[in-house]
């Protein structure tokens, strides 16, 4: 059963889906260059918004992608999904909510919800990244220090 407080870090449990998760909101202002001829945010920009939210989440946990690279770990994208529900427009203030629902293994899966300032859901998405040794370019398990960071930030759903 899930603990009522923060998740306790235990490698043997990291395959389990917890009732708890990590969520983080990132605000993004739509620039004119992000829009297409129809005046909508071009679909490709949502992938960039996901990346910005991931980087912001990592920094909020006390770790940057540059820190990970210095520790010899890189995280390439393995899979991306994006579902467009409503358009966003120039100068909209978007909230990109990132959710981490599962403890990572050799891969980590992030989910995204993009809202406009009226709270309307515009887009949902998912990215799956792998953990790779930067020197050998070979897959590896999630490092213990990364699992501990995630476990320390785990919150009730």
Task: Identify the residue ranges that each predicted region occupies.
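Hydrophobic pocket/interface hotspot
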Residues: 39, 98, 137
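Hydrophobic beta-strand-centered segment that forms part of the acyl-chain substrate-binding groove
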Residues: 57-95, 99-103, 107-109, 122
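N-terminal amphipathic/basic-hydrophobic helices that include classical n-h-c signal peptides
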Residues: 1-20
